[in-house]
Amino acid sequence: MLQIYNTLSRSKQVFKPIVPGKVKMYVCGMTVYDFCHIGHARVMIVFDMVVRWLRASGYEVQYVRNITDIDDKIIKRALENSEPISALTNRFIAAMHADSDELGLMHPDQEPRATDYIQQMQGMIGKLIENELAYQGEDGDVNFAVRLLPRYGQLSGKTLDELNAGERVAIGGGKRDPLDFVLWKSAKPEEPADTRWNSPWGEGRPGWHIECSAMSCDLLGAHFDIHGGGADLQFPHHENEIAQSEGALYGQNRQENDAPFVNYWMHNGHIRVNEEKMSKSLGNFFLIRDVLKSFDPEVVRFFMLKAHYRSPINYSDAQLEEARSGLTRLYTALTHIPEVDTVPIDLQNPWAKRFADAMNDDFNTPEAIAVLFDLASEVNRAQGAEKQMLAGLLKSLGGTLNFLQRDPTNFLQAGSKDQSGLSSEQIEEHIAARVAAKQAKDFAKADGIRKALLEQGVVLEDKPGGITEWRRA
């Protein structure tokens, strides 16, 4: 039975979908003004894993991940580049899709762009004004009146008295209270024409928080199963989403028997780089595409899922090399077994049960991967039909996390992308020269070739019958 840690309740809860057998899930996606970094990769990989396991468990999943394609940062970058907003955002949406595809991730079922949902956002803002939870200030902005919603702070655990307005937002001329946040930003004279839309409150554009409320409610309904995102979005973004969505539906006082906006809130942990916060100023800011120049996409996914999704993780080349070594162990167990086919996962099987128990415990991928390592050791010990069956089970269980689906030799010979640069053909030439040296009984030369290849990250393994296999270290 699946249990999910719900940020809202601060506890693990048995997962009970609103409609039996069906799951509606919304994840906050990217703001597209630059290339995606490894923090974005973690969000993509974590919720890709969640969807895969839900589907493997028999659920029909509707997976929605939005794109923020209008935002202050987007406007600033477009002005710097002297290009239209749409040209900038389309370019980085294409780059995001390319990164996601190279990582081997599934596409969301729906990927709404904020600019396609302006009408829905305006409708929700109008409802909040009608419910006396929003107002238009003197500067033309429409703001949410935070203090009028008594339950504000339920997700973050912050009370209105605890909130420090100075830390959140500087009070503007149009706000009645420093805690209030903007729903609709009035257009400024210097802003481009493609950043403004007509509205009942004058020309302007939506605030960031209202975008996700409107898109999720339009596509999934006012009450759905799972909302996910990075831990940094818990407050204020997700807190504000709850305020807007429930405020529009129920007004100022949601009753106990009223359905909440979302049943389960999931948040993945931060990424640190060499034990420091990732930032451009520290020079430790890594783009997905740059990481993939040095490391195999499957290695990057394995690195991300070796840690529990809620835990912070430390990014370093050493950690990625460790992940590569771990995957190498698993793939090595599948070598020398003809035609390893996946097998149906029978939860009566003790290996499958251990794996499923781990995944059903709040998607505990570290424990699930530990089961894969134990199973790989058993594959190495087994013989005959049992070895074939266990290898198929290893491939099947790994496949639920999108691991171990390649030809083992292909993975083992791919190695790290920042190796010496020896091609497969060059390595085979060295192996042929070593075979010739051994046949000529020049064992010193043969050993020298082995050592030279090892220094360049290539491991040779002599097999019965005079066969030599190789893999990258």
Swiss-Prot record:
**Keywords (A to Z) from UniProt:** Aminoacyl-tRNA synthetase, ATP-binding, Cytoplasm, Ligase, Metal-binding, Nucleotide-binding, Protein biosynthesis, Zinc
Q: Fetch the CDD domains from UniProt.
A: Anticodon_Ia_Cys, CysRS_core
Summarize where Zn(2+) binds, as residue positions. 28, 212, 237, 241
- Give the record's family classification: Belongs to the class-I aminoacyl-tRNA synthetase family.
According to the UniProt record, one GO cellular component term is: cytosol
- Required cofactor names: Zn(2+)
The organism is Polynucleobacter asymbioticus (strain DSM 18221 / CIP 109841 / QLW-P1DMWA-1) (Polynucleobacter necessarius subsp. asymbioticus)
Q: Does the keyword Metal-binding apply?
A: yes
Q: What is its EC number?
A: 6.1.1.16
- Record text on cofactor binding: Binds 1 zinc ion per subunit.
Q: Motif span ('KMSKS' region)?
A: 277-281
Query: Where is the motif ('HIGH' region)?
Result: 30-40
Provide the reaction this enzyme catalyses. Answer: tRNA(Cys) + L-cysteine + ATP = L-cysteinyl-tRNA(Cys) + AMP + diphosphate
Annotated GO biological process: cysteinyl-tRNA aminoacylation
Q: Where does ATP bind?
A: 280
Entry keyword annotation includes Protein biosynthesis: yes
Subcellular location, in the record's words? Answer: Cytoplasm
Protein name according to UniProt? Cysteine--tRNA ligase
Q: How does it assemble?
A: Monomer.
Origin superkingdom: Bacteria
